[in-house]
Regions:
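Perimembrane helix-loop-helix junctions
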Residues: 4, 9, 167-191, 202-234
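Signature aromatic-anchored transmembrane alpha helix within multi-pass, membrane-resident enzymes
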Residues: 18-25, 230-231, 235, 301, ...
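Extracytosolic helix-loop segments that constitute the early lumenal/periplasmic catalytic or substrate-binding loops
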Residues: 27-33, 44-71, 75-90, 169, ...
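Membrane-interface alpha helices of multi-pass inner-membrane proteins
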Residues: 28-33, 135-149, 163, 169, ...
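Short acidic/glycine- and proline-prone juxtamembrane loop motifs at membrane-interface regions
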Residues: 40-42, 147-158, 327, 483
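Transmembrane-helix motifs of polytopic, lipid-linked glycan transferases
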Residues: 99-131, 164
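Hydrophobic, aromatic-rich transmembrane alpha-helices
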Residues: 117-118, 278-305
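Catalytic lumenal/periplasmic loop and adjoining terminal transmembrane helix
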Residues: 242, 357-517
Length: 524
């Protein structure tokens, strides 16, 4: 009985490129141009801001506490710094420059996915070619991958290196392959790069090591060469980190000491050991997480020698013993697991073998279609509500040669108590300037105090800083900011960053206030 007949959309090849990879490329292109902001703050504070400082646009002493603690590897920031430098050569707008970084990220993920599907046999024995093709389709069209393909976070960066690793092991360490020392050395190097892309990927290397020893029965000589390759790559990145931090540093050791020994990570929240098992079935973010959990659970019994089985459970249990848990921590492995889903579909088909397979697996076609639909929606949807507004105001400033002054809240960092803006400094430009609440308070004291009057606060700050356009995120729902009290301000938008209720008041400029109000509401 045939498990899966590829629908017309995915049937055949266009040249040597499979249509589902073309779909992934399309989602990546859309994400580059339409997906503004980031999925998680770490994407900026630990990567883009670091890269921005590396190319000389930002200040090292204004980076997040991770820089002072010297716990962040510089591999991905330098990966982002090169296209970022090119982007700022083309335009001084950060909203243009970041597109170059997203484009490189999307291209890298596409190359890694293509290599994995071409070289890795997914290490799931018993799947026929059609089922393997289905696994590739499910991977390339998954909502999680579509959502992150044009991101710059470490989760998708690590997932791309994992796919390269799985493709390499599939090509060189299959059951019919003879092991060679050079293959083990380069495998170790690849693991070293993956480890410095995200330190939690050490669980993957541990799983691979035990798999090579127990299942593949690699010799101690070959395993030692593998470790040598890992150490060689690690040494290169230790030197890079030491150069960027201005002194010898082993960032993995610092990371472990800060987050595990000192418990800094736990200050962001702790969860019981079983939290991930609960989230598999309840979290809306983990699209397909329950299916991955069910499939990999079955694989423990029916495919215990599968490398993916070892990697998945090492990764899950390794993260389960750490007190601080976030669903995104599992993304690097969950992104890859759809290639295993056809195994579950095959088991179901055997249970209902008396039913025509075309009728049994019509839900598979629906799953692919729905994944594509949601993937496209995700690619078009801006990630950060406030960044769409910032980009728009930046364009206003450039068109009218005016400055936009931003006043936003700050948040405490858990380790040192330093305060950094919620919106990264990366998005500041000659047309987007910053004023902090403490500056406003100081100005109030010098003028005899007007802290109880939000309208006078806005008026005074705008007048003293002399911006032609002023943007405020003051914590107030007071709509009394009218033309009578703010007649020296060209543009005021109140409480836009922290609220979905937008109050826009337009003075002097040719911007249509009603249109801006509707636009801002639509973006938020």
């Amino acid at each position: 009985m045939q498990l899966y007949k590829p629908p017309l959309l995915f049937n055949g090849l266009i040249g040597n490129v499979k249509p589902h990879l073309l779909y992934l490329a399309l989602v990546g292109v859309i994400g580059v141009f339409f997906s503004i902001g980031y999925l998680y703050p770490d994407e900026h504070f630990q990567i883009i801001e670091f890269a921005n400082a590396a190319i000389g646009r930002g200040s090292f002493d204004k980076l997040a506490w991770e820089y002072g603690s010297r716990i962040r590897p510089w591999l991905q920031p330098w990966f982002a710094a090169i296209p970022l430098k090119l982007g700022f050569f083309v335009s001084d707008s950060p909203f243009v420059a970041i597109k170059f970084v997203k484009a490189l990220s999307a291209f890298f993920v596409l190359v890694a996915t293509s290599y994995f599907l071409r070289c890795g046999n997914y290490d799931v024995d018993g799947l026929n070619p059609k089922e393997r093709q289905l696994g590739g389709v499910l991977l390339a069209t998954s909502v999680l991958l579509s959502q992150m393909v044009a991101s710059t976070n470490s989760e998708i960066f690590a997932a791309a290196w994992l796919m390269l690793l799985l493709g390499y092991t599939g090509r060189n360490f299959g059951p019919d392959r003879n092991e060679k020392s050079a293959q083990h050395f380069w495998c170790g190097c690849l693991n070293g790069v993956m480890f410095f892309s995200r330190f939690q990927m050490g669980f993957v290397y541990a799983a691979l090591g035990f798999w090579l020893l127990v299942i593949r029965r690699s010799s101690l000589k070959h395993l030692s060469i593998n470790v040598l390759g890992f150490l060689t790559a690690s040494l290169a990145f230790v030197l890079l980190d030491s150069y960027m931090y201005g002194g010898f540093v082993v960032t993995p050791a610092n990371y472990f000491h800060a987050n595990i020994i000192e418990g800094v990570a736990s200050r962001f929240g702790i969860s019981p050991w079983y939290a991930y098992f609960f989230e598999f079935g309840t979290s809306g973010r983990l699209v397909g997480g329950f299916l991955s959990f069910a499939t990999l659970t079955v694989m423990v019994f029916v495919r215990p020698k599968s490398l993916l089985t070892w990697i998945f459970w090492f990764f899950v249990f390794g993260h389960s013993v750490v007190a601080h848990k976030e669903e995104r921590f599992l993304f690097p492995v969950l992104i890859v697991t759809p290639v295993c889903w056809p195994l579950m579909f095959g088991l179901v088909s055997k249970v209902v073998k008396k039913t025509d397979s075309g009728k049994v697996f019509w839900p598979v076609r629906v799953l692919v279609a729905v994944s594509c639909l949601f993937g496209l929606i995700t690619a078009f949807r801006p990630r950060g509500q406030k960044y769409g507004v910032l980009e728009y105001l930046d364009s206003i400033g450039r068109a009218q040669h005016q400055a936009v002054c931003l006043d936003w809240d700050v948040k405490d960092q858990p380790k040192s108590g330093e305060r950094v803006p919620i919106v990264p400094a990366f998005y500041q430009s000659p047309y987007v300037q910053v004023m902090f609440p403490q500056d406003l308070d100081h100005a109030n004291k010098r003028t005899g105090g007007c802290a109880d009057d939000p309208a006078r606060q806005v008026w005074y700050t705008a007048k003293k800083t002399s911006p032609e356009v002023y943007f405020s995120s003051l914590k107030t729902s007071d709509a009394s900011l009218t033309c009578q009290t703010t007649n020296n301000i060209d543009l005021v938008i109140v409480d836009l960053i922290s609220s979905d209720r937008v109050h826009a008041f337009i003075h002097k400029t040719g911007v249509n206030g009603e249109q801006l109000y509707l636009w801002a509401c639509r973006r938020t």
